[in-house]
Amino acid sequence: MSIDEILEAVEGLTVLELNELVEKAEEKFGVSAAAPVAVAGGAPAAGGAAAEEKSEFDVILASAGEAKMKVIKAVKDLTGLGLKDAKALVDEAPKAIKEGASKEEAEELKAKLEEVGATIELK
């Protein structure tokens, strides 16, 4: 199988299938797909600049709450997933709804999902 054929196969996967692929690759090859984290060099000097504000957020569905069907519909509408994939994502909570979202997008997703009863965390 050529690299182009592999890429074509990956393009056809759903978000949940891609997540499963990443998890299996991590297990098989003993690696992590997590972004590298910078290690702090120590405490900032007195009078130093304020810590830089975080610019990317992961929107995590912690719980669907009482109105699970409304949350599934909202996840489906907000992510573009099919009904089956949206239901699977909600059933697997806590689970990332969106990774690497801007602050505005993350806050908007959080507000819309909390409006239908979901418990959301921003990381």
Curated annotation (Swiss-Prot):
Source organism: Finegoldia magna (strain ATCC 29328 / DSM 20472 / WAL 2508) (Peptostreptococcus magnus)
SUPFAM superfamilies xref list: ClpS-like, Ribosomal protein L7/12, oligomerisation (N-terminal) domain
InterPro entries in the cross-refs: Ribosomal_bL12, Ribosomal_bL12_C, Ribosomal_bL12_C/ClpS-like, Ribosomal_bL12_oligo, Ribosomal_bL12_oligo_N_sf
Family: Belongs to the bacterial ribosomal protein bL12 family.
Gene Ontology CC terms, in alphabetical order: cytosolic large ribosomal subunit
Keywords for this protein: Ribonucleoprotein, Ribosomal protein
UniProt GO MF annotations: mRNA binding; structural constituent of ribosome
Identification of the protein by name: Large ribosomal subunit protein bL12
Biological process (GO), any one: translation
Top-level taxon in the UniProt lineage: Bacteria
Function: Forms part of the ribosomal stalk which helps the ribosome interact with GTP-bound translation factors. Is thus essential for accurate translation.
Subunit structure and binding partners: Homodimer. Part of the ribosomal stalk of the 50S ribosomal subunit. Forms a multimeric L10(L12)X complex, where L10 forms an elongated spine to which 2 to 4 L12 dimers bind in a sequential fashion. Binds GTP-bound translation factors.
